[in-house]
Regions:
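Acidic, Ser/Thr/Pro-rich beta/coil linker or hinge segments at domain junctions
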Residues: 53-97
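Active-site-proximal betaalpha loop/short-helix elements
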Residues: 1-30
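Helix N-cap motif at beta-to-alpha junctions
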Residues: 38-44
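Short amphipathic alpha-helices in soluble, non-transmembrane regions
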Residues: 45-55
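Short beta-strand-to-turn element immediately C-terminal to the catalytic PLP-Schiff-base lysine
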Residues: 36-38, 75-76
Length: 97
């Protein structure tokens, strides 16, 4: 799977706080989010349906699945490089509800 960092919808306030605190938004608690893996031929219709709903206004296609069954989840960074999206090491930050 190859993700595009620039395509991941992160609120500017969240991005600023993460940058200030040295955190990666992918590894902090986040509620009310959905990652859907759909067939390529259905992607446009699924995205359009999500965007049509008030709660899906920030829906986005953030990547694609590779045909290589041994491929790691990777991300193309904002600078054009690639990095492996690894499991979180250690304990996640607690949710504040």
């Amino acid at each position: 799977m190859l993700l595009q960092e620039a395509a991941i919808p992160v609120l500017p306030q969240v991005a600023a706080a993460c940058e200030l605190l040295g955190l990666d938004p992918l590894y902090i608690a986040n509620e009310g989010k959905l990652v859907a893996i759909v067939a390529l031929e259905a992607a446009d219709a699924v995205l359009a349906a999500m965007l049509a709903h008030p709660l899906g206004r920030s829906a986005a296609c953030i990547g694609h699945v590779s045909a290589d069954p041994h491929c790691f989840v990777q991300m193309t960074t904002a600078f054009g490089g690639r990095r492996v999206v690894d499991w979180l090491s250690g304990e996640p930050l607690p949710r504040i509800c």
